[in-house]
């Protein structure tokens, strides 16, 4: 008796741009053979707003409020990189106190970024409970931002060329330490709930594996790179701001799969807490109320307490600040990886060229490669582990 042969034809399925599990307006054109992915083509550009061209038609002072809308989970990082570029090009010094304040804001943003990644990622793989937990801690970070900058999630407009917009309010450092005391045990709770959960581990272990050489060749950065065994963190490598003053370790894993990327981000939250604690204790001048009391008690106006390192801004830059002739590329480590700015000045108030490097755009490029051979049910887990925000991908 002749045996019937089963033949299958490839089927093309569209994921997004409006999909409940899609992280923004991303469209994936996926070719399937049964339940197996044989090809994937990401389609981006739905959220393109011309941020680079806007930068070239605005003064650098005017442009700072725009950039936090690119990545609403990492607004402080984009504010930092946008002011770092003209600072370095014009050799503008940054007071030590201002640098510490910047580090505090950046590390709080790193924790908020990882929390916003953790909740939806776990919801994607079927764990609903942690999704509600993460907003409890993020709310405390929003309260700290609101007290310091006047704004909660985006458009903080706090970073300035040469420093920050204002000094920390009275009692802010104490509240920040209280948050650290609260949040440390919460990370332990997350780990008890998630890390060794057998269902969670079976769901994502071995998915989306990226080898060390692949991660380097694809120019990955951030947790995507460190989860593949490469201990590369720009806070250590470039030593920008005042990160050399703190004792902390680079979080890395070797497996390169979704589970390793989860472990790296959880450990990064612990390291960020450590940096915040140290910064709160070591900030030049201490809390604002103590610094002002010392200044009032000091009659000698040439005392160190009135020096530049105890100011929150070196010199307020005029709205007509001209970007000097020259070009440079500057970068920093955000929660998603390396973000950078290439700036080219021509002694005008607006830059001649302003190129932004978004970490998640580079990280997203490897998605078709790691999806081949995966099951259709694993697409969202692998995509979620990359951590993309389409505002910064499309710009």
UniProtKB/Swiss-Prot annotation:
It comes from the Bacteria. One of its GO terms (molecular function) is oxidoreductase activity, acting on NAD(P)H, quinone or similar compound as acceptor. GO terms for biological process: photosynthesis, light reaction. It is an enzyme of class 7 (translocase). GO terms for cellular component: plasma membrane-derived thylakoid membrane. Its EC number is 7.1.1.-. Keywords: Membrane, NAD, NADP, Plastoquinone, Quinone, Thylakoid, Translocase, Transport. NDH-1 can be composed of about 15 different subunits; different subcomplexes with different compositions have been identified which probably have different functions. Belongs to the complex I 49 kDa subunit family. PANTHER family: NADH DEHYDROGENASE [UBIQUINONE] IRON-SULFUR PROTEIN 2, MITOCHONDRIAL, NADH-UBIQUINONE OXIDOREDUCTASE 49 KDA SUBUNIT. This is NAD(P)H-quinone oxidoreductase subunit H.
């Amino acid at each position: 008796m002749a045996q019937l042969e089963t033949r299958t034809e490839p089927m093309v399925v569209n994921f997004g741009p409006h999909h409940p599990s899609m992280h923004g307006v991303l469209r994936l054109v996926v070719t399937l053979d049964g339940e197996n992915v044989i090809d994937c083509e990401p389609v981006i550009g739905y959220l393109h707003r011309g941020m680079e061209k806007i930068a070239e038609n605005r003064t650098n002072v005017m442009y700072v409020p725009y950039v936090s809308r690119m990545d609403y989970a990492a607004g402080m990082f984009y504010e930092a990189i946008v002011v770092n570029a003209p600072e370095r090009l014009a050799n503008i010094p940054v007071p030590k106190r201002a640098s510490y304040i910047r580090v505090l804001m950046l590390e709080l943003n790193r924790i908020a970024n990882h929390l916003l990644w953790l909740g939806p990622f776990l919801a994607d793989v079927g764990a609903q409970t942690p999704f509600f937990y993460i907003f409890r801690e993020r709310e405390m970070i929003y309260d700290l931002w609101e007290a310091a900058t006047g704004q909660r999630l985006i458009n903080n407009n706090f970073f300035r060329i040469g420093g920050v917009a204002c000094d920390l309010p009275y009692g802010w450092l104490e509240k920040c330490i209280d948050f650290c005391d609260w949040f440390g045990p919460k990370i332990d709770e997350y780990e008890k709930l998630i890390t060794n959960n057998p269902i969670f581990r079976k769901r994502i272990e071995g998915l989306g594996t990226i080898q060390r050489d692949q991660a380097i060749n694809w120019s990955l950065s951030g947790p995507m790179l460190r989860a593949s065994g490469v201990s590369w963190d720009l806070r250590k490598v470039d030593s920008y701001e005042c990160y050399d003053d703190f004792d902390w370790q680079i979080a890395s894993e070797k497996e390169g799969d979704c589970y390793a990327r989860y472990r790296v981000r959880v450990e990064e939250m612990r390291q960020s807490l450590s940096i915040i604690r140290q910064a709160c204790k070591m900030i030049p001048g201490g809390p604002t109320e103590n610094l002002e009391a010392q200044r009032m008690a000091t009659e000698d106006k040439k005392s160190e307490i009135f020096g530049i390192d105890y100011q929150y801004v070196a010199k307020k830059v005029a709205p007509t600040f001209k970007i000097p002739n020259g070009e440079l590329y500057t970068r920093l480590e955000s929660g998603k990886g390396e973000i950078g700015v290439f700036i080219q000045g021509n002694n005008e108030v607006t830059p001649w060229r302003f190129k932004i490097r978004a970490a998640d755009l580079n990280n997203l490029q490897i998605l078709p490669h790691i999806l081949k051979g995966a099951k259709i049910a694993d697409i969202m887990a692998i995509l979620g582990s990359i951590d993309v925000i389409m505002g910064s991908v499309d710009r």
